[in-house]
């Protein structure tokens, strides 16, 4: 499979070209008011992602990535480690956020666990540029989701300090996302 076809496939899989976006262009989002439990669950979801992502660099112990990809993965891991440390003691209006209560139904959490196992198997079975592209595509998904979640959290959290922190982490993740796309482009040109 050519690198160009692989890149296009990765873009499709990561949701960059959804059929809705291709058909209708971008749309303005509707602003929805969250309940107090929604904000707590949003933080719990973010905490769960940070919990997993802070260790993504452990994959580099058993798999070899190119030097630029490995450096980027380590930076992603460090950033999620910082986010995890910030979220761990987080409270809203004096109430500690329950990190295990993300509000997702069992069908969703079971499906997410299965997807994670499948992606791990895929990563372990790949090597070279194909491994780099596959690994980077998983990070596109995680960073895009986390960034969107942080944006919504910043809109809804009544604490100005929490809003500022959410927006600061969103900027960091968006910066990492930009670096990932640059690395994917370099890999595609090299292939």
Which functions belong to the PLM regions below?
Residues 8-16:
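Bacterial N-terminal signal peptides
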